[in-house]
Amino acid sequence: MHIINARLRNQEGLHELHLENGLISNIGRQTEAPTLGPDDLDAGGNLVVPPFVEPHIHLDATLTAGEPRWNMSGTLFEGIECWSERKVTITGEDTRTRVRKTLQSLAAHGIQHVRTHVDVTDPQLTALKAMLEMREESRHLVDMQIVAFPQEGIESYRNGRELMEEAIRMGADVVGGIPHFEYTRDQGVSSVKFLMDLAERTGCLVDVHCDETDDPHSRFLEVLAEEARSRDMGSRVTAS
Protein backbone atom coordinates (compact mmCIF):
# COMPACT_ATOMS: atom_id res chain seq x y z
CA MET A 1 0.00 0.00 0.00
CA HIS A 2 1.13 3.56 -0.73
CA ILE A 3 0.01 6.95 0.51
CA ILE A 4 0.73 9.49 -2.20
CA ASN A 5 0.66 13.29 -2.40
CA ALA A 6 1.36 13.62 1.32
CA ARG A 7 2.78 16.68 3.02
CA LEU A 8 5.07 16.16 6.02
CA ARG A 9 5.98 18.47 8.87
CA ASN A 10 9.06 20.62 8.21
CA GLN A 11 9.44 19.13 4.72
CA GLU A 12 8.99 20.83 1.37
CA GLY A 13 7.02 19.28 -1.47
CA LEU A 14 4.94 16.12 -1.65
CA HIS A 15 5.96 12.70 -0.39
CA GLU A 16 5.01 9.07 -0.89
CA LEU A 17 4.77 6.63 2.01
CA HIS A 18 5.25 2.90 1.44
CA LEU A 19 3.49 0.59 3.91
CA GLU A 20 4.13 -3.09 4.54
CA ASN A 21 2.23 -5.22 7.05
CA GLY A 22 0.56 -2.16 8.49
CA LEU A 23 3.84 -0.30 9.12
CA ILE A 24 5.61 2.48 7.22
CA SER A 25 8.60 0.91 5.47
CA ASN A 26 9.83 3.90 3.48
CA ILE A 27 9.16 7.59 2.91
CA GLY A 28 10.36 9.31 -0.25
CA ARG A 29 9.97 12.65 -1.96
CA GLN A 30 7.78 12.56 -5.06
CA THR A 31 9.65 13.65 -8.16
CA GLU A 32 6.86 12.89 -10.61
CA ALA A 33 3.12 12.30 -10.56
CA PRO A 34 2.56 8.85 -9.00
CA THR A 35 0.08 6.25 -10.18
CA LEU A 36 -2.70 5.47 -7.72
CA GLY A 37 -3.10 1.72 -7.24
CA PRO A 38 -6.31 -0.02 -6.13
CA ASP A 39 -5.13 -0.26 -2.50
CA ASP A 40 -3.42 3.14 -2.38
CA LEU A 41 -4.57 6.32 -0.67
CA ASP A 42 -4.28 9.80 -2.14
CA ALA A 43 -3.62 12.31 0.66
CA GLY A 44 -4.48 15.11 -1.74
CA GLY A 45 -1.70 17.39 -0.53
CA ASN A 46 -2.86 17.21 3.08
CA LEU A 47 -0.60 16.89 6.10
CA VAL A 48 0.19 13.35 7.27
CA VAL A 49 1.21 13.08 10.94
CA PRO A 50 1.70 10.28 13.48
CA PRO A 51 -1.50 9.11 15.20
CA PHE A 52 -2.83 11.03 18.18
CA VAL A 53 -3.06 9.77 21.76
CA GLU A 54 -6.10 9.86 24.06
CA PRO A 55 -4.35 9.62 27.46
CA HIS A 56 -7.43 9.79 29.69
CA ILE A 57 -10.94 8.62 28.88
CA HIS A 58 -13.64 6.61 30.69
CA LEU A 59 -14.93 4.37 27.91
CA ASP A 60 -17.20 2.41 30.25
CA ALA A 61 -19.20 5.59 30.90
CA THR A 62 -19.15 6.97 27.37
CA LEU A 63 -22.45 7.99 25.73
CA THR A 64 -24.38 7.90 29.02
CA ALA A 65 -24.98 11.64 29.54
CA GLY A 66 -28.47 12.18 30.92
CA GLU A 67 -28.86 8.56 32.00
CA PRO A 68 -30.58 8.12 34.40
CA ARG A 69 -30.60 11.90 35.00
CA TRP A 70 -28.65 15.03 34.18
CA ASN A 71 -25.93 16.44 36.42
CA MET A 72 -27.80 19.63 37.27
CA SER A 73 -25.11 21.11 39.51
CA GLY A 74 -22.37 20.49 36.97
CA THR A 75 -20.08 19.28 39.74
CA LEU A 76 -17.77 16.30 39.66
CA PHE A 77 -19.35 14.74 42.70
CA GLU A 78 -22.91 14.85 41.34
CA GLY A 79 -21.51 13.41 38.13
CA ILE A 80 -20.11 10.49 40.11
CA GLU A 81 -23.51 10.05 41.77
CA CYS A 82 -25.20 9.96 38.36
CA TRP A 83 -22.72 7.37 37.12
CA SER A 84 -23.23 5.23 40.23
CA GLU A 85 -26.95 5.12 39.44
CA ARG A 86 -26.29 4.27 35.78
CA LYS A 87 -23.67 1.69 36.69
CA VAL A 88 -26.17 -0.67 38.31
CA THR A 89 -27.97 -1.01 34.96
CA ILE A 90 -25.00 -1.78 32.71
CA THR A 91 -24.56 -5.07 30.93
CA GLY A 92 -21.71 -6.44 28.89
CA GLU A 93 -23.56 -5.82 25.64
CA ASP A 94 -24.55 -2.30 26.65
CA THR A 95 -20.92 -1.49 27.44
CA ARG A 96 -19.52 -3.09 24.29
CA THR A 97 -22.00 -1.25 22.06
CA ARG A 98 -21.13 2.16 23.51
CA VAL A 99 -17.38 1.49 23.57
CA ARG A 100 -17.39 0.22 19.98
CA LYS A 101 -19.12 3.37 18.74
CA THR A 102 -16.74 5.64 20.66
CA LEU A 103 -13.62 3.82 19.48
CA GLN A 104 -14.74 4.16 15.88
CA SER A 105 -15.14 7.90 16.42
CA LEU A 106 -11.72 8.18 18.05
CA ALA A 107 -10.05 6.29 15.22
CA ALA A 108 -11.83 8.44 12.64
CA HIS A 109 -10.26 11.49 14.29
CA GLY A 110 -6.75 10.06 14.09
CA ILE A 111 -6.44 8.59 17.58
CA GLN A 112 -4.62 5.27 17.72
CA HIS A 113 -3.47 5.01 21.34
CA VAL A 114 -6.07 5.06 24.14
CA ARG A 115 -5.75 4.80 27.91
CA THR A 116 -9.16 4.18 29.44
CA HIS A 117 -10.11 4.11 33.10
CA VAL A 118 -12.67 1.42 33.92
CA ASP A 119 -14.70 1.44 37.13
CA VAL A 120 -13.90 -1.70 39.12
CA THR A 121 -16.02 -0.83 42.18
CA ASP A 122 -18.53 -3.39 40.99
CA PRO A 123 -18.65 -6.87 42.54
CA GLN A 124 -19.32 -8.39 39.11
CA LEU A 125 -16.65 -6.34 37.28
CA THR A 126 -19.09 -6.14 34.36
CA ALA A 127 -17.50 -3.15 32.64
CA LEU A 128 -13.99 -4.54 33.01
CA LYS A 129 -14.94 -7.85 31.43
CA ALA A 130 -16.52 -6.03 28.49
CA MET A 131 -13.52 -3.72 28.12
CA LEU A 132 -11.08 -6.63 28.03
CA GLU A 133 -13.13 -8.08 25.17
CA MET A 134 -13.14 -4.73 23.37
CA ARG A 135 -9.38 -4.40 23.73
CA GLU A 136 -9.00 -7.56 21.69
CA GLU A 137 -11.77 -6.73 19.22
CA SER A 138 -10.37 -3.27 18.47
CA ARG A 139 -6.68 -4.12 18.11
CA HIS A 140 -6.86 -3.31 14.41
CA LEU A 141 -8.04 0.22 15.27
CA VAL A 142 -6.32 1.28 18.50
CA ASP A 143 -3.79 0.25 21.11
CA MET A 144 -5.73 0.25 24.38
CA GLN A 145 -4.43 0.43 27.95
CA ILE A 146 -6.95 -0.38 30.68
CA VAL A 147 -6.72 1.28 34.09
CA ALA A 148 -8.33 -0.52 37.03
CA PHE A 149 -10.11 2.53 38.43
CA PRO A 150 -11.83 2.34 41.86
CA GLN A 151 -14.44 5.06 41.26
CA GLU A 152 -15.99 4.68 44.72
CA GLY A 153 -12.71 4.19 46.55
CA ILE A 154 -10.43 1.34 47.53
CA GLU A 155 -10.67 1.51 51.32
CA SER A 156 -14.17 3.05 51.35
CA TYR A 157 -15.75 0.42 49.10
CA ARG A 158 -16.55 -3.08 50.33
CA ASN A 159 -13.86 -5.51 49.13
CA GLY A 160 -12.18 -2.67 47.27
CA ARG A 161 -8.70 -4.13 47.63
CA GLU A 162 -9.79 -7.55 46.45
CA LEU A 163 -11.54 -6.07 43.40
CA MET A 164 -8.41 -4.13 42.46
CA GLU A 165 -6.26 -7.23 42.72
CA GLU A 166 -8.75 -9.27 40.70
CA ALA A 167 -8.87 -6.59 38.00
CA ILE A 168 -5.10 -6.80 37.57
CA ARG A 169 -5.23 -10.60 37.51
CA MET A 170 -7.87 -10.42 34.78
CA GLY A 171 -5.65 -8.29 32.57
CA ALA A 172 -5.91 -4.59 33.44
CA ASP A 173 -2.65 -2.84 32.50
CA VAL A 174 -2.58 0.04 34.96
CA VAL A 175 -3.38 0.46 38.67
CA GLY A 176 -5.64 3.42 39.41
CA GLY A 177 -6.83 5.23 42.51
CA ILE A 178 -8.91 8.12 43.82
CA PRO A 179 -7.54 8.97 47.29
CA HIS A 180 -9.46 12.24 47.73
CA PHE A 181 -12.74 10.31 47.38
CA GLU A 182 -12.00 7.98 50.30
CA TYR A 183 -13.94 8.69 53.50
CA THR A 184 -10.96 9.95 55.52
CA ARG A 185 -7.45 11.24 54.87
CA ASP A 186 -6.01 8.15 56.56
CA GLN A 187 -7.95 5.96 54.13
CA GLY A 188 -6.73 8.10 51.24
CA VAL A 189 -3.10 7.67 52.26
CA SER A 190 -3.65 3.96 52.83
CA SER A 191 -5.18 3.60 49.37
CA VAL A 192 -2.13 5.21 47.76
CA LYS A 193 0.23 2.89 49.61
CA PHE A 194 -1.89 -0.12 48.64
CA LEU A 195 -2.09 0.74 44.95
CA MET A 196 1.64 1.43 44.81
CA ASP A 197 2.31 -1.92 46.50
CA LEU A 198 0.07 -3.62 43.94
CA ALA A 199 1.78 -1.93 41.01
CA GLU A 200 5.25 -2.64 42.35
CA ARG A 201 4.40 -6.30 42.93
CA THR A 202 2.82 -6.86 39.52
CA GLY A 203 5.00 -4.59 37.39
CA CYS A 204 2.02 -2.48 36.31
CA LEU A 205 1.92 1.22 35.56
CA VAL A 206 0.07 3.65 37.86
CA ASP A 207 -2.48 6.35 36.96
CA VAL A 208 -4.21 8.02 39.91
CA HIS A 209 -7.03 10.56 39.93
CA CYS A 210 -5.53 12.92 42.49
CA ASP A 211 -6.92 15.95 44.34
CA GLU A 212 -9.84 16.64 41.98
CA THR A 213 -11.33 19.04 44.50
CA ASP A 214 -11.22 22.68 45.55
CA ASP A 215 -10.41 21.58 49.11
CA PRO A 216 -6.95 23.05 49.89
CA HIS A 217 -6.43 20.33 52.48
CA SER A 218 -6.56 17.59 49.85
CA ARG A 219 -2.85 16.92 49.41
CA PHE A 220 -2.58 13.39 48.11
CA LEU A 221 -0.39 14.41 45.19
CA GLU A 222 2.55 14.79 47.55
CA VAL A 223 1.81 11.37 49.05
CA LEU A 224 1.80 9.77 45.60
CA ALA A 225 4.95 11.64 44.58
CA GLU A 226 6.83 10.47 47.67
CA GLU A 227 5.73 6.88 47.16
CA ALA A 228 6.94 7.06 43.56
CA ARG A 229 10.25 8.62 44.63
CA SER A 230 10.96 6.23 47.48
CA ARG A 231 10.20 3.19 45.32
CA ASP A 232 12.10 4.54 42.29
CA MET A 233 8.90 4.21 40.24
CA GLY A 234 8.65 7.79 39.00
CA SER A 235 8.62 6.95 35.29
CA ARG A 236 5.74 4.51 35.82
CA VAL A 237 3.44 6.84 37.76
CA THR A 238 0.91 9.37 36.44
CA ALA A 239 -1.31 11.71 38.46
CA SER A 240 -4.30 12.75 36.38
Question: What residue spans do the PLM features occupy?
Answer:
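Active-site gating loops and adjacent loop-to-helix segments of metal-dependent hydrolytic enzymes
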Residues: 62-95, 171-174, 220-239
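Divalent metal-dependent hydrolysis catalytic cores, especially in the metallo-beta-lactamase
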Residues: 78-89, 99-126, 131-132, 139-152, ...
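Histidine/acidic residue-rich metal-binding segments in metalloenzymes
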Residues: 126-137, 157-239
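Short, acidic/polar
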Residues: 94-103, 156-166
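N-terminal metal-binding scaffold of metallo-dependent hydrolase/deaminase domains
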Residues: 1-35
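Divalent metal-coordination and catalytic microenvironments
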Residues: 6, 22, 45, 56, ...
